[in-house]
Curated annotation (Swiss-Prot):
Protein name: Annexin A4
Entry GO CC: cytoplasm; nucleus; plasma membrane; vesicle membrane; zymogen granule membrane
Gene that encodes it: ANXA4
Listed SUPFAM superfamilies: Annexin (SSF47874)
PTM annotation (N-acetylalanine): residues: 2
Membrane disposition: Peripheral membrane protein
Protein keywords: Acetylation, Annexin, Calcium, Calcium/phospholipid-binding, Cytoplasmic vesicle, Membrane, Phosphoprotein, Repeat
PROSITE patterns in alphabetical order: ANNEXIN_1, ANNEXIN_2
Organism of provenance: Sus scrofa (Pig)
One Pfam family matching this protein: Annexin
Length: 319
């Protein structure tokens, strides 16, 4: 069985004040010692990085984030700043970035809201309100529309049942309702899909997907693809994928961020930073299984310089 869990672990023999001095030295005077910055920050846990930031302020009298911002640039800066941000706040900042200014990064909104646990969603809501003085839901409403808006608002409520409880009658009813809302009739009753996919617990949904296949002879994903479209379709598919296998969902997000011409660096950075301590080993295993190549080799071929160095450390090894 492949190793599970994260690739970034808390460093043993950790000394925040020493790390703070190393970082200051790396940025003081002319030029920047990027390797020294990487050697400290890429090998510490998120919690340890917060301690380093505090030690930096108390022993040097400067803000580490401000110094990093002025010394670094481009994708390397973005990945380092992401690593320096507490987990929930990082999600909150990404959600805000996805909606700020012209255009919307729908993929980012879907990825975060479909993959985080109800508890994480609740913390995201609180932090968003504190950070920006308005609710996440209000921003979603002003930035999106129609069924896509409704599915995001529903996910952002964090109201999914977290139990394991299975009611066979309800499983059959949900599967039948989904069938009747889509495949069985002309036109689609989108609200039914939303209700079932956004509120039921994972165990229940996995049984609903099996029952749905039995009744309709189709995977629920196939039906979603043929019955819905656009960002609403993307959101429903993300929910189903996260329920079936969350690590495989992230492997696909990473694959799509790098395949073909150009790189979607925002997605690549966000997934690598936010999953490094949670399930990067599982993501790697799924990546290899789905695409026949290692995540490591993909990152190596698609990025360069210090940016590549950090991502490869977060990846944690070749498969």
């Amino acid at each position: 069985m492949a190793a599970k869990g994260g690739t970034v672990k808390a460093a043993s023999g950790f000394n925040a004040a020493e790390d703070a001095q190393t970082l200051r030295k790396a940025m003081k005077g002319l030029g920047t010692d990027e390797d020294a910055i990487i050697s400290v920050l890429a090998y510490r846990s998120t919690a340890q990085r917060q301690e380093i930031r505090t030690a930096y302020k108390s022993t040097i009298g400067r803000d580490l984030l401000d110094d990093l911002k002025s010394e670094l640039s481009g994708n390397f800066e973005q990945v380092i700043l992401g690593m320096m941000t507490p987990t929930v706040l990082y999600d909150v900042q990404e959600l805000r970035r996805a909606m700020k200014g012209a255009g919307t990064d729908e993929g980012c909104l879907i990825e975060i809201l479909a993959s985080r646990t109800p508890e994480e969603i609740r913390r995201i809501n609180q932090t968003y309100q504190l950070q920006y003085g308005r609710s996440l839901e209000d921003d979603i409403r002003s930035d999106t529309s129609f069924m896509f808006q409704r599915v995001l608002v529903s996910l952002s409520a964090g109201g999914r049942d977290e139990g394991n409880y299975l009611d066979d009658a309800l499983v059959r009813q949900d599967a039948q309702d989904l069938y009747e809302a889509g495949e069985k009739k002309w036109g689609t009753d989108e609200v039914k899909f939303l209700t079932v996919l956004c509120s039921r617990n994972r165990n229940h949904l996995l049984h609903v997907f099996d029952e749905y296949k039995r009744i309709s002879q189709k995977d629920i994903e196939q039906s979603i693809k043929s019955e819905t479209s656009g960002s609403f379709e993307d959101a429903l598919l993300a929910i189903v994928k996260c329920m079936r296998n969350k690590s495989a969902y992230f492997a696909e997000r990473l694959y799509k961020s790098m395949k073909g011409l150009g790189t979607d660096d925002n997605t690549l950075i966000r997934v690598m930073v936010s999953r490094a301590e949670i399930d990067m080993m599982d993501i790697r295993a799924n990546f290899k299984r789905l695409y026949g190549k290692s995540l490591y080799s993909f990152i190596k071929g698609d990025t360069s310089g210090d940016y590549r160095k950090v991502l490869l450390i977060l990846c944690g090894g070749d498969d």
